[in-house]
Amino acid sequence: MLTERSARVATAVKLHRHVGRRRAGRFLAEGPNLVAAALARGLVREVFVTEVAARRHELLLAAHEASVHLVTERAAKALSDTVTPAGLVAGCDLPATRLEDVLAGSPQLIAVTVEIREPGNAGTVIRIADAMGAAAVILAGRSVDPYNGKCLRASTGSIFAIPVVVAPDVGAAIADLRAAGLQVLATAVDGEMALDDADRL
């Protein structure tokens, strides 16, 4: 059984930070819903689970071939970024999602956020875009890391169902959307048209 001092656990704990995720090309997904969604997407490399959680989620773990490591409760707490650890955490590969790949599919609707910094808000946008049938979400400008734990939880798994693209250059991203034939509409607090009248566009 792995403890919080185990090298494998210590390496995974570094994925709580953006720099750690970027360097490793991996992220952590916690809880049965997110882990199940990540497993279905084929992103899970390994799973850390306590004995109690292993019994509770036996069917979920048995249905996939990812490496499963039993961990102590203290290790599970170190791997968690929530107040109440679920005892089930997956180490996942960051998906390589590019805007050109999304546009190659001739999308009809793409949700774009600009300079969104709050992970909960970003996750909510991803969840809503998925529910609306959008082909992708673009986080443009200096935006939050979509694989931040809070963003993952706010997306309620939608981040595994819809491509999410990080595009630091806002102008270039908008230009690419227009070049692909998409009409670009923006919302603003002081916009010229109310949303109720937007169907005229």
Residue ranges of model-derived segments:
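Post-transcriptional modification and biogenesis factors for structured RNAs
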Residues: 1-201
